[in-house]
Amino acid sequence: MFKLLSVTSRTLCKEDFLARVGTICAAGIDGIILREKDLSEPEYQSLAINVLQICREKGTPCALHTYVTAAKSLHAEALHLPLHAFLALGEKEKRAFPTIGVSCHSLVDVVAAQEGGCSYVTLGHIFATDCKKGLPGRGLAFLSEVCRHASVPVYAIGGINRDNIARVRDAGVSGACIMSGLMTCRDPAEYLEELRHAL
């Protein structure tokens, strides 16, 4: 089943961020990655307590991002890391999390993450996006090539919308990560329905 994941960016959100997370969960998103890297670890942990509670109430899987100590203290089941941080994790730390995702930007990255024992990877950015201003997307041929060699689920990220999501799916990914669209849209339920209808 093709999954849709929400990668958060509270600075893009015009309404109360926690309310938006709740709305996205209620709309049936397949998972949330709480990516708020500008926060200090104590600030992130404080936010994560509330987000994890919302996700648990809605039955939505939630991965905490970057801050390993906070994730361990909150008994998070899923952790998402940049590749360099994942490779620096000890085996005992890895075992603390049933699911660990890794952000990758090349086939070499994906191979390294796989060899390190990750659960899944995100791969991007696939299309040009305001989140990576001035940088061209890596494209669908790149995505297809990586998917052919990957032995773990690959989730595409970067500029994915209803106009291109079917082509992303056809490249062989397990799902897509949506950031700005779900943070800024008027109605997350309607937005997700449009994405699923396009598949």
Predicted regions and their residues:
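Conserved beta-strand positions in the central sheet of alpha/beta enzyme cores
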Residues: 33, 63, 80, 101, ...
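A short beta-strand-loop structural module common to alpha/beta enzyme folds
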Residues: 30-39
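Glycine-rich phosphate-binding active-site loops on the catalytic face of alpha/beta enzymes
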Residues: 6, 83-93, 122-134, 162-198
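Catalytic cores of alpha/beta
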Residues: 62-77, 105-117, 149-156, 160-178, ...
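Alpha-helix-loop-beta-strand connector modules within alpha/beta enzyme cores
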Residues: 44-66, 83-86, 91-106, 134-162, ...
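Alpha/beta enzyme core
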Residues: 16-31, 74, 84, 107-124, ...
